[in-house]
Amino acid sequence: MIDYLRVKFLRFFLLAIATVLICLGLAAFQQERIEASDASETTIASTTWQHGSFPVENFQSYTSPFGYRISPIDGKRQFHNGLDMAAPLGSYVRNWWTGKVLEVSDGTVCGTSVKIQSGGWQHVYCHLDGHVETAANGRYLLDRSGGIQIWQGQELPVGARIGRVGMTGRTTGPHLHWTLRYNGSYVDPALVLKEMFKQQA
């Protein structure tokens, strides 16, 4: 009888632990949820993209899409907030849309990067060659070998060369990590590129 009660208690105890672990996992998943974009496929399809520029020269392939994935760095499930585009090291990166440089940065997982504002859109270019320097009149991204100097606050035309594909930050190979936000929410860059190509064809 005592063995029977022990087995029953053990089963109840294990079931309780499993329930707690599942609830904790679901809570973590809820916290991990990323704010959905208000740039729906309909909005993207109804926007004129004819003047946009593909963001990388010597493009080879898309290596990691937008959305949840298993990280190639640590093997954990994570939200990948952009689109990875492989290109040979040193390939030039071009400004997708006319806009103002909000920030140049380095020393993060994004590596050397440029963030540009174009109306309600923000576009970020990560893992660039070079580094950020500070002068009396502000901060700027410097890539001497590529002839690139981009200042925070600078207005940039569409298609301008703003950097080169590098290996800065957390990366497993040379590529451009390109992130888009519309009114503060992430947007799948592949949807925008697809519509852009359709309109430019």
Tell me the role of every PLM-derived stretch:
Residues 91, 121-124, 185:
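Short acidic/polar mixed-charge low-complexity motifs
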Residues 80, 127, 175-179:
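Histidine-centered divalent metal-coordination motifs
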Residues 1-45:
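N-terminal secretion targeting segments of exported proteins
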